[in-house]
A protein has these predicted regions:
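Positively charged, low-complexity/disordered segments
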Residues: 1-10
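ATP-dependent carboxylate-amine ligase
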Residues: 9-130
Length: 130
């Protein structure tokens, strides 16, 4: 709902978002649109690209973004780099939403599962900042 959208934009000023490869392409446009509307800054990144080019997936997400919101977007294909960048530019009292991986502790690239954990990356990055 609009109320939930407004509340989310007040809380999650910065987001890291990705869409999976080999999935519904139409949802990528919606994800790009929603994430850009609900953030002051959003980084589009990879999230299990599987056999697709991660840059093409991000391009699909960008295609769903209104022109007025395009200045909010940064695309960083490398998910670790995206999380580190978002952590470094976050301001005190910002809440950073890193969406997509959830409980998964891997990235699927081509047919390989590569160890990857958003929480570990965030923890390491924040420890280095102290």
């Amino acid at each position: 709902t609009h109320r939930q959208s407004s509340a989310a934009s007040d809380v999650y000023k910065r987001q890291v978002v990705g869409c999976g490869g080999g999935r519904d392409r139409a949802k990528r446009l919606k994800m790009g649109s929603i994430a850009s509307r609900l953030s002051q800054k959003v980084i589009f990144t990879s999230d299990n690209p599987r056999d697709e080019d991660p840059k093409s997936i991000i391009d699909d997400m960008i295609a769903g973004v209104d022109d007025a919101d395009k200045s909010k977007i940064l695309n960083i294909v490398d998910r670790k780099e995206a999380i580190v960048k978002a952590s470094k530019v976050a301001k005190p009292n910002d809440i950073l939403l890193v969406a997509g991986k959830g409980h998964e502790k891997y990235q699927i690239i081509k047919s390989k599962k590569i160890r990857f954990n958003d929480k570990e990356i965030l923890t390491q990055t924040l420890k280095m900042a102290v």
